[in-house]
Amino acid sequence: MSAANWCENAVFYEVLVRTFQDSNGDGVGDFEGLESRLDYLQWLGVDCLWLPPFFASPLDDGGYDVADFLSTHPDFGSVEQLSHLLDAAHSRGMRVIADLPLNHTSIAHQWWREELEALRAIDAGTLDAADFTPRYVWSTTGEEYADARVIFEDTETSNWTFEPSVGRFYWHRFFSHQPDLNYDNPAVQEDMLDVLRFWLSKGLDGFRLDAVPYLYERHGTNGENLPETHAYLARVRAMVDEEFPGCVLIAEANQWPRDVVDYFGSEEAPECHMCFHFPLMPRIFLSFARGEASSIDRILADTPQLPAGAVWGTFLRNHDELTLEMVDDVERADLYARYAPEPRMRANVGIRRRLLPLLGSAEAVECAVAMLLSMPGAPFLYYGDEIGMADDIWLVDRDGVRTPMQWDGSTNAGFSPQSSYPPVLSTMPNVQAALADPTSLLYAHRRLIAQRKAVFDASDDWCIVASDEVFAFERAGVLCAFNVTAEPQSVTVAGIEVYLPGHGYAWVPLVDRVLPHLVGQRFYGGSADSSGVQIVRAESWQFGGVWLTVESAGAFYRTLVDATGRDLLAQYAAEGDDAAGAGVGVDVVGYVRGLLAERGHTLVGDVQAQRVGGEQSNTSFVVGSWVVKFQRRLAEGVNPEVLVADALADCPHAAHVVAHDEGACVATVVPLVDGARDGWELALERGLVGDDSGEGVDVAGLGAAIACVHAALDEGHVQRRENLLDCLRERMVRTGTQAGLGDALSSGLIEVLSNTGAGSDQVPVQRVHGDLHLGQVLWDSSRWVLIDFEGEPAATPAERAAEHSPMKDLAGMIRSFDYATQVRARENAASSSTAADAGAGAVEQATQVLLDGYRQAGGTVDEALLQAYLLDKALYEYDYELHHRPDFRYIPARALKALGIATPE
């Protein structure tokens, strides 16, 4: 194992051996049971297990009442079984630390029994008091150290308890059955060092040192943080560093950060590698209770700078009560009122409840966990909180938050049917059910942990930028924002408008993280230089991830991201059904189900989301009997596809929009053409017209389908031919100039456009498909269906909604014929040297069949205008291929040459 700095980035997970998993049918968790669940913990992303005391104990205080530091509790297993557990964890890349109660023992400890015997011997005169150094702290009056507070004030009235068998009072900072050790006795110091040596030599990776501020007592002090305590901890650290390098020490000191920081020690005398930040935890809950985050900001502002290599341990819940010692009376009253209105919900100066019952919703839990995982420090999670386990306020002390882990829906939740204590809860969220639901809190934990590891580092600086209803900070190129209220909130941070639902959060990757994943996406046409890119909006999406609106050169793009900056829809499409398990966590199915329900439609059955193949400027998925399309480029105005939905509702050859969303996610849903294949795929497989290499496709039927769609969209509008040609000319000049065609374009345009003036002065115009090609038509074995009426992706909504001659769609399809035949010819070139020429002949033949089918279905073909639109489309293709796919430039170049426009070789 490596040096002890491994803890700086680790995710810790507290697991009670007694209640995690039993292996031998006795209903009590044990080492072998825990070992059997290591794969689950590895899957979750846990780096280090934290085990509360597993030593021999009467278990009057959950094992913190130790009866023998050098043996294990027999119910949990043997020392050898523990060693096997440690080896199994290490083989999975996980470490294991344990609690060590340095301060006290149980009255069942042999040391205590020997102490009482010695004191009785002194009183009897059989032992010289000068030969006796007590292991515990005694008084004849019980009046010493009066300035030390009583910690468990609801069960203990004093830190002294009278022991009648010896006629003396003994000192205990905790329960009266846990007498404090006397660290002024050198033998106690050595014995406890030997305890550490024993377990570290067995393979433990460190200790959480329980209750370290109270090791020594001095008159006139509060008995906390004494110089002698720090001196002893420095001695412990020196031994660990020398004899067990790579092992860690963690201080449990429930005090203000300015006091706790001393437990890190100094450069000359280091003490603990980590310390818990106790005051932060209740202030996170206070922020959710009050709906304002300033209390978090204030405690962080009061937190001193850490020494190099030192790490705060942060947490939300653990095996103890949610301690409220480090808040004032007003804050404590607010916390009790919000989270523990019933007295049974309280313990000591705190609240004995689990995370989900405290915060009240999975959304609030996920928000709080995301906050914990993105803050500096090493986060500690508590077993069962990842599945939303409840608590039992009717159990004694803190046992209500220590109930058995719930693995499945069986009677005993995966434990053997023997009775267990604490008993299994009647409410049954469980791991098995959570694993079957990619939207579960469990999967959310896994995704958050994975993103934390991919993005954040212990050395990252951070800057708090908002602390009202939204707590926000910037760290490691990620803007982290958390809405601590139940109402939607927005805040502008670093120029980004951040929108969050109630108790929502967003990890917003900044430009340098997002841009590498954007460049190369089909929908992105912006700059590859971060100086030319700006994130203007971020919106947390309830179905997973954060929608970013990215601006570059006046264009706006949409990408759904996590903290790494990767595009989650692209990742989802790449990983398919395993996307949620791989950490993507986008619920496309749930989104479509809800969107359809709002419009009175139903998504039937247990369905998956499958990516629609082919290159698209948007991202589409088949979900059951529907297709959802996520818009990736934004512009002002109504989506053109929505505008024609009503007109196409009764057309059998059009997949029209039945539901759309203009909120955080801009998307449309259309019916799926069941069992259909797109025209591009068919053309490559069969050829356009029947020949020796393929049976061909129904091109005539395609022409008829296009005519049917045009008839549905026709509103009887006309435009002067001259005006239409002027618009086409202007567009073609602009496109050709971008492509560097220059004078060749000018002369070619004159020749082509001179032939378009013949015919009626009034030209029919209407809303058309606008981006028609073989990839936009589906064949279901009996009919063609046109899809995606959005128009040209690069155009504005106004341009896409503009009326054109129907010849625009026919020209687009004919140009697609050319591409399909050329690509097919290219694939068959090895076996046929004349394939390209044969392909050209196939295009001419298919074009004629298409136009005949169009006419027979009632469409009118304006041959002159068709030529103009063919030139316009070929110029657009040439410019696109020149800048994006140079290897395909030859296809539109051949078409331009046939139209009289020469292109560079």
Region roles according to the model:
Residues 512-539:
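Short Lys/Arg-enriched alpha/beta "domain-start" segment
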Residues 830-864, 868-905:
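ATP/Mg2+ or Mg2+-diphosphate-binding catalytic cores
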Residues 543-733, 782-783, 794-829, 836:
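Conserved ATP-binding subdomain of kinase catalytic cores across diverse folds
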Residues 767-770, 774:
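Catalytic-loop of the protein kinase fold
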Residues 600-607, 733-767:
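An alpha-helical support segment within catalytic cores of ATP-dependent transferases
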Residues 788-792:
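Activation of the activation-loop gatekeeper triad in protein kinase-fold domains
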Residues 776-786:
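Conserved protein kinase catalytic/activation segment
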Residues 1-511:
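Active-site and adjacent substrate-binding regions of carbohydrate-active enzymes
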